[in-house]
Amino acid sequence: MTGLERQLTEMLEAPVGALGYELVGLEFVRAGEHSTLRVFIDHENGIFVEDCAEASRQISAVMDVEDPITVAYNLEVSSPGLERPLFKAAHYQQFVGHEVSLVLKMPMNNRRKWKGDILEINGEIVTVTVDGNNEEFALSNISKANLVPKF
């Protein structure tokens, strides 16, 4: 998570929470004049289009006042979806036993991409069973983590 993403998360957690939603996480993708702020929200009863619209209006209002992003961007608000991104240690704990796809910032054993089942989370270390071996990953070295849907 970048410094800007951390700042945005702290700024948006309370307003999104006040609407009754969980701010699962967010990502800011810089692409010149096509930059995108993706905000993922959830609710115990699921997320519907109306929920995303309501959260989008609230987030837009906060962003207009605080103005933390200096470039033009598009705001996308959605549910985490089937390939739910994992941002926090609590997310890994919630999905122990589920398959996850990881992309690392720095390679481990000459690999940046890993896929396996979440075994446990201990502090800032997540243990994933990959091909029968338990591998430990520092959360600080994970650039992207998503659940792998089962069909």
Curated annotation (Swiss-Prot):
GO biological process: ribosomal small subunit assembly; translation
Compartment(s): Cytoplasm
This protein's UniProt keywords: Cytoplasm, Ribosome biogenesis
Matching Pfam families: DUF150_C, RimP_N
Record has Cytoplasm as a keyword: yes
Lineage top rank: taxon: Bacteria
Family to which this protein belongs: Belongs to the RimP family.
Name this polypeptide is given: Ribosome maturation factor RimP
Organism: Aliivibrio fischeri (strain ATCC 700601 / ES114)
Gene symbol of the encoding locus: rimP
